[in-house]
Amino acid sequence: MSSPTSKNVSETNGNKPKKSAKTSSNTKGGSMDTRAELADLIKKKAETSEQLANLERQIYAFEGSYLEDTQLCGNIIRGWERYLTSNKATNSKADKRNRKFKEAERLFSKSSITSMAICNPERASESDSITNEDSSDNQISINQNTTTAHDGTTTIKSTPKDEKDSPSHRNEGSVVSGMVSGSTNSGGNKDLLGTPTSNTKSKLSTNSSATAKKSGHINKKIRHR
């Protein structure tokens, strides 16, 4: 006869695979639920974005009609001065011309990035292209500055410290300095030799006057004889 403990062990062993099957089914059901929730959230996001786009279009159109209707008499953006100065008996064609407004006067539409992208996709793309061109130009100028700076550093660092400290480099420097000083001294001596001083000029003038006086005395003696 089998003991009751062996029966309990066999029963527990028989029930184990059933539990694993239940857990696997629960995990599958949970993954399916999360996918369904994610799909619902994506669908709701698309619906809300579409509603927001429609609302932005309505605001854009209403703002344009408001600016056109109040361009002659004044509005909350341009003020109310035109209401007092405007001529009410105007021509219909001139009225239509004057009703045109500038896009810069749009205040509510420009306050939202989504409205600018939805209502004016071409202008949004143009602004993006302009910003990209500006960034590329700035990058090119930065690269040019870095290359010139690198060239300057290479020219400055052409003679390293080891070569400057070497005795050959010192001898070359002393020879060059001696040649420069010698050339300056020789130039100074040439200038001294080439240009007479004031003392030599005075001596020459006195000698010439003395010789002139002697020649005058000799001529007088000859005539007297």
From Swiss-Prot:
InterPro entries: Eaf6 (IPR015418). The keyword Transcription applies. One of its GO terms (cellular component) is nucleus. One of its GO terms (molecular function) is acetyltransferase activator activity. It comes from the Eukaryota. Residues 1-15, 127-158 have a biased composition (Polar residues). GO terms for biological process: chromatin organization. Residues 214-225 have a biased composition (Basic residues). The keyword Acetylation does not apply. It holds the Pfam family NuA4. Residues 173-189, 197-213 have a biased composition (Low complexity). Residues 159-172 have a biased composition (Basic and acidic residues). Residues 30-65 form a coiled coil. Residues 1-34, 120-225 are annotated as: Disordered. Keywords: Chromatin regulator, Coiled coil, Nucleus, Transcription, Transcription regulation. Its main location: nucleus. Component of the Enok complex composed of at least Br140, enok, Eaf6 and Ing5. Belongs to the EAF6 family. Component of the Enok complex which has a histone H3 acetyltransferase activity. Might be involved in transcriptional activation of selected genes. This is Chromatin modification-related protein MEAF6. It comes from Drosophila melanogaster (Fruit fly). The gene is Eaf6.
